């Protein structure tokens, strides 16, 4: 869970994500049309926050960073798991206590009764991706300010809550799958793909604004276009098929790092491998396998349960030897036996995945998995989690040790008095490892440099910049 911050002067986040607004600073602005905004949850929710803020800034509202400076606070909530629900409710309560005027939106907004039971004094509640409804509620409770309509109050790319050099590109909304542990479809609906021309227009604007890395996100990236039967769209006057491969081809021609998230292991992924092997798309796949036991995958109702996953991974690595695979897994799912768990550990040994996250199963209100028999005890969940992480740390450490002495490109994220911190193609922001370059204080965020790896641990690399290498600022 991250909580992002909006700086109205530079439309970027702080380097360490924090809450948008703080409670202890006195108001220094005139009153009337000032919005405080707190964005909780995943990158897809962050994109929704960017869209709402862009519309409000276009209409002349100011966005401020403290509770005291705000005339009204919007909280964009997360409701994916129970801990996220509690964080959302706590944040709403904090905003009410410090400001008093709060509009709630986002995934938890579909549970209006639950919110009002805890916080009856919120001004309004909307569900996820209800952009116009949120703005209309702001109009109702905070009159639209007078402003010069000919003055451009936002950049061409809109308000962005990420650093200037990378941006999330959401290509669709919703999901057609019905995994038993997940309630996303009940909150965000079935798959709805954005028009491909609209996506490519946005990507081009981001490129023109200096963005170096596009992080392609959705609930199911590999299903992009399925809902519209991959119909033909248009971009720059030319026909373009609405599909993941065609989208990746066009994005890869723009000269940015293109990183794919939330991909399912369908056969269609094979078609993207040549783009990764040729350097048009980063050789990085974020694929949530979730488990390796066929029986548990069936209980989860995972769409790829019947796929020959290991065969696909081997084929992908043959087509693109540099491929980095990130995945997430659940341990302690209802009915998981020691035999099932051992299948998962064996899969880690066989698959040799580069980046892995693991979660202990917990019930989520409204999820069908709650009703499955044979729950796993908390003690067993913890024990399996520790065994899983120990296994994966050994794999990750060995893989990173083999990179010592190699030359890599590094996208710089942060520079301080000790040096620079960046990421390689193998590292997505916030969730993967980092590359440390000690002493390189003259670099800037957004620079792309060449470096030689000198040291590694289980997750991160230490490198030195290659002399006389070109910077891409």
UniProtKB/Swiss-Prot annotation:
Its EC number is 2.8.4.4. One of its GO terms (molecular function) is aspartic acid methylthiotransferase activity. PROSITE patterns: MTTASE_N, MTTASE_RADICAL, RADICAL_SAM, TRAM. It is found in: Cytoplasm. [4Fe-4S] cluster 2 binds at residues 175, 179, 182. Binds 2 [4Fe-4S] clusters. One cluster is coordinated with 3 cysteines and an exchangeable S-adenosyl-L-methionine. InterPro entries: Elp3/MiaA/NifB-like_rSAM, Methylthiotransferase, Methylthiotransferase_CS, Methylthiotransferase_N, Methylthiotransferase_N_sf, NA-bd_OB-fold, Ribosomal_uS12_MeSTrfase_RimO, rSAM. GO terms for cellular component: cytosol. Pfam families: Radical_SAM, TRAM_2, UPF0004. It is an enzyme of class 2 (transferase). Residues 33-143 form the MTTase N-terminal domain. It comes from the Bacteria. [4Fe-4S] cluster 1 binds at residues 42, 78, 107. Residues 401-467 form the TRAM domain. Its main location: cytoplasm. Its cofactor is [4Fe-4S] cluster. Signal peptide: none annotated. Residues 161-399 form the Radical SAM core domain. It catalyses: L-aspartate(89)-[ribosomal protein uS12]-hydrogen + (sulfur carrier)-SH + AH2 + 2 S-adenosyl-L-methionine = 3-methylsulfanyl-L-aspartate(89)-[ribosomal protein uS12]-hydrogen + (sulfur carrier)-H + 5'-deoxyadenosine + L-methionine + A + S-adenosyl-L-homocysteine + 2 H(+). PANTHER family: RIBOSOMAL PROTEIN S12 METHYLTHIOTRANSFERASE RIMO, RIBOSOMAL PROTEIN US12 METHYLTHIOTRANSFERASE RIMO. Catalyzes the methylthiolation of an aspartic acid residue of ribosomal protein uS12. Belongs to the methylthiotransferase family. RimO subfamily. This is Ribosomal protein uS12 methylthiotransferase RimO. It comes from Pseudoalteromonas atlantica (strain T6c / ATCC BAA-1087).
């Amino acid at each position: 869970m991250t909580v992002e911050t909006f700086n109205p002067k530079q439309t970027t986040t702080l380097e360490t994500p924090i809450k948008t607004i703080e409670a202890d600073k006195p108001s220094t602005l005139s009153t009337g049309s000032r919005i405080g905004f707190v964005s909780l949850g995943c990158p897809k929710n962050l994109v929704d926050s960017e869209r709402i803020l862009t519309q409000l800034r276009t209409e002349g509202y100011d966005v401020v960073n403290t509770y005291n400076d705000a005339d009204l606070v919007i909280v964009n909530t997360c409701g994916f798991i129970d801990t996220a629900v509690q964080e959302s409710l706590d944040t709403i309560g904090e905003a009410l206590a410090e400001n008093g005027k709060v509009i709630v939106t986002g995934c938890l907004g579909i549970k209006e009764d639950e919110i009002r039971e805890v916080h009856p004094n919120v001004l309004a509640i909307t569900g996820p991706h209800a952009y116009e409804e949120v703005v209309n509620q702001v109009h109702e409770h905070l009159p639209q300010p007078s402003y010069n309509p000919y003055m451009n109050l936002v950049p061409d790319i809109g308000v962005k809550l990420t650093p200037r050099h990378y941006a999330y590109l959401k290509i669709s909304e919703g999901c057609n799958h019905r995994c038993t542990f997940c309630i996303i479809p009940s909150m965000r609906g079935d798959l709805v793909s954005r028009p491909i021309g609209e996506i490519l227009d946005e990507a081009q604007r981001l490129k023109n604004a200096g963005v170096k890395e596009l992080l392609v996100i959705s609930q199911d990236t590999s299903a992009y276009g399925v809902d519209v039967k991959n119909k033909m769209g248009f971009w720059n006057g030319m026909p373009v098929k609405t599909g993941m491969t065609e989208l990746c081809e066009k994005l890869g021609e723009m000269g940015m790092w293109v990183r794919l998230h939330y991909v399912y292991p369908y056969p269609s992924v094979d078609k993207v491998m040549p783009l990764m092997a040729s350097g048009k798309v980063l050789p990085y796949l974020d694929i949530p396998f979730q488990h390796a036991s066929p029986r548990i995958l069936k209980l989860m109702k995972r769409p790829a349960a019947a796929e020959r996953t290991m065969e696909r991974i081997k084929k992908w690595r043959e087509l693109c030897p540099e491929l980095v695979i990130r995945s997430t897994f659940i341990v302690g799912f209802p009915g998981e036996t020691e035999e099932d768990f051992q299948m998962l550990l064996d899969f880690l040994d066989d698959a040799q995945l580069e980046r892995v996250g693991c979660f202990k199963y917990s019930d989520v209100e409204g999820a069908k998995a709650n009703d499955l028999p044979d729950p796993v005890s908390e003690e067993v969940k913890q024990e399996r989690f520790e065994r899983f992480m120990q296994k994966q740390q050994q794999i990750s450490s060995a893989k990173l040790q083999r990179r010592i002495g190699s030359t890599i490109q590094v996208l710089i994220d942060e520079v301080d008095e000790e040096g620079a911190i960046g990421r390689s193609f193998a590292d997505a922001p916030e969730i993967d490892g980092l590359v440390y370059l000690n002493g390189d204080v003259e670099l800037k965020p957004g620079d792309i440099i060449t470096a030689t790896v000198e040291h590694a641990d289980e997750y991160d690399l230490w490198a030195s910049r290659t002399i006389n290498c070109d910077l891409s600022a």
